[in-house]
């Protein structure tokens, strides 16, 4: 029996916290149109994601994918690190 998996949401965002073990907080920035004025307004939503090997560091650009609930707040997992942060 070959059942096909449902499509899962994939987001790209910046790591804003990596202080937890095997967990990162990713801020995904996007925009919405203001209902009255029609201007595009930027906003960010933060997601907690599972990082099994602690690969992602602060300010890295990462890709996360929706998955089953892993804890009370984690619903995403790290797919890959797109761009490493520049350390000065």
From Swiss-Prot:
- UniProt GO MF annotations: rRNA binding; structural constituent of ribosome
Q: Which domain of life does this protein belong to?
A: Bacteria
* GO biological process terms, semicolon-separated: translation
Do you know which InterPro entries this protein is assigned to? NA-bd_OB-fold (IPR012340), Ribosomal_uS17 (IPR000266), Ribosomal_uS17_bact/chlr (IPR019984)
Which keywords describe this protein according to UniProt? Ribonucleoprotein, Ribosomal protein, RNA-binding, rRNA-binding
Q: Tell me, what does this protein do in biology?
A: One of the primary rRNA binding proteins, it binds specifically to the 5'-end of 16S ribosomal RNA.
The record's annotation in NCBIfam families points to: PRK05610.1 (NF004123), uS17_bact (TIGR03635)
Query: Which PANTHER family does this UniProt record tie to the protein?
Result: 40S RIBOSOMAL PROTEIN S11 FAMILY MEMBER (PTHR10744), SMALL RIBOSOMAL SUBUNIT PROTEIN US17M (PTHR10744:SF1)
Q: What protein is this chain from? A: Small ribosomal subunit protein uS17
Report the source organism.
Oenococcus oeni (strain ATCC BAA-331 / PSU-1)
Report the gene name.
rpsQ
